Amino acid sequence: MEQQSLKVVIVGGSIAGLTLAHCLHRANIDHVVLEKRAEIAPQEGASIGIWPNGARMLEQLGLYGELEKLTEPLNLMHIAFPDGFSFEDLLPTTINQRFGYPIIFLDRQKFLETLYRKYPDKSKIVTNTRVAEVQSSEKCARVITEDGTMYEGDIVVGADGVHSLVRREMWKLGDSKQPGSVPSREKTGMTVEYSCVYGISSPIVGLRAGESVNSYMDGMTVLTFHGKGGRVYWFLIQKLHQKYTYPNTPRYTVEDAERLCTDHRDTTIWKDIRIGHLWDNREVVSMTALEENLFAKWHFHRIGLMGDSIHKMTPNIGQGANSAIEDAAVFSSLLVHMMTSEGPGRPSSARIQRLLHDYQACRYERAEMIYHRSRFGARFQSRDDAVKLIVGRYVVPRIRNRLANISSMLIANGEIIQYLPFPKRSGPGWEKFRNKGEWMPYTPFALFSAILLVQHVVPLLGLTSPLLLAS
C-alpha cells in the first residue's frame, strides 16, 4: 500500500496502542507511539485472555502464532459454589471447535513483549516519554511532552488507559473550543464498586493445565486460568462496602492484597483448593480498584480515544483486551478507507472529525453491549442479590449447554481489519452465530430471570405455574 502523507500520534504503548501501531504499519501510515514508562512490558502480575474475536485480528497481523506458542489452550471450565456443589462445562472446547481459535491466557508482560518484538521499526516506539499537553488546530494536532519535545500529526489517539491524560486534555479542549460539547456527567461517570487482587502463581496440585475455575461466592468471585506448564493466572474480585466516584477511588498496595488473601486463605475455591494455595504459590501479585464506565464521547476535533480510556470494564468476561484490539482494527480500517477513497494529500480537519465520528458510530453499540455484559457478569458471579444467587446456583447448571451459545454470539459479531486478508484459520461459528442477537443486556434481567425461575426452579420445588402448564 502506497505511503500517504498523514501521521498518527499514539499516546500509550500498551495493548490498544501497540496493536494500532501494527495496524498502521501494515497500511504504511506514518505514526509514533509515546509511552510514559521506561519499558514496554513490565511484570506487574497481570494476565491477558485472548478470545477468538481478538485472536482473529492478531492472526491478520501475523502475531497470533507467536502468542499461541506461549499458552495452553483452555478446554474445560469448572463452576463452583459455596455449598460445595460444582459442575464442569466444555465451553472452551466448543468455542475452539466453532471458531478455529481456543481461549488462551498468558502473562500480559509476554503479550506486550511479543507485540514489541514483532514490531519492525522500534524507532517509532518512544518510551520514558510523559505527555504534558495535547493541542488541536485546523492544521494539525500536537502532543507536547514534559521535557518540551513536540510531536505533530494529523490525529492524536489516546490509548493511555483508564487514567487517560489524553481524555482529560480532550475535555479541556472541548470546554474551551465548544462549551457544552463534553457533558458534565462524563467527568463523574466512572465508578468503583469492586476491588481485584490479581496474580500469577506457580503450578498448584489439583489445578490442571488447560482448565479454569469460576468460583461464585457471596460478595466475592475467584477466577483461575491454568496455562502452559500449569502456570495459574488468578483474580480475586470483592464487592466493596460502598460505591466510589472517580477520581476519588481507593488505592491499594501489595500489603492490602496480602491482608485480604490472608483473611480468606481458608476459603474454598473448588474441591480442596483454597485461596491460601494461590497466595502461597504466588510469583507476582497486585491489587487495584475496578473502575467501570462507558464514556459517551470518544473524540473531539483531531483527538480520538480507544481501549480502557473509553470503555473500562471488570475482568469477569475477559473482553477488555479484545475490545481494545477491536478498537484498533476499526479505527485503522476507517482510516485506510478514507485515504484510498480520497486520494493522496493531508485530509482536512473536517474530514478527520468525520472519521472519528464514524469510528465511534461503528464501535459504540458493540462496546456498550460488552460493557453491560461485563457489568452484569461481575454482579452475577458475586451473587449480588437473591435472584442472581438462585439463578446462578439452580438455573445455570441446568442450561450449561446454552452458555457456549451466549459466548458464541458475542465472538461471531467481532470486528476485523478490513484491509488485510481474512485468516484461513476459521470455523463454522463465525457464520452460524453472526447477527443472531446478543442475548443480554437487551432482555431486561428481571424479566429474563423470572422466566428462568419459572421454567427451571419452580419444578424443583414441586410447584406448577401457568407458564409451565401452557407449555
Swiss-Prot record:
Pathway stated in the Swiss-Prot or TrEMBL entry: Secondary metabolite biosynthesis; terpenoid biosynthesis
Cofactor: FAD
Coiled coil: none
Residue ranges of the TM segments: 403-423, 443-463
EC number: 1.-.-.-
InterPro entries: FAD-bd (IPR002938), FAD/NAD-bd_sf (IPR036188), FAD_mOase_fung (IPR050562)
Gene Ontology MF annotations: FAD binding; monooxygenase activity
Topology of the protein relative to the lipid bilayer: Multi-pass membrane protein
Pfam family of the protein (one): FAD_binding_3
Catalytic machinery residues: Y216
Example of a GO biological process term: terpenoid biosynthetic process
Binding site for FAD: E35, G49, R108, D308, A321
Keywords assigned by UniProt, alphabetized: FAD, Flavoprotein, Membrane, Oxidoreductase, Transmembrane, Transmembrane helix
Stated role: FAD-dependent monooxygenase; part of the gene cluster that mediates the biosynthesis of anditomin, a fungal meroterpenoid. The first step of the pathway is the synthesis of 3,5-dimethylorsellinic acid (DMOA) by the polyketide synthase andM. DMOA is then converted to the phthalide compound 5,7-dihydroxy-4,6-dimethylphthalide (DHDMP) by the cytochrome P450 monooxygenase andK, which is further prenylated by the prenyltransferase andD to yield farnesyl-DHDMP. Further epoxidation by the FAD-dependent monooxygenase andE leads to epoxyfarnesyl-DHDMP.
Protein name per its UniProtKB record: FAD-dependent monooxygenase andE
Gene expressing this chain: andE
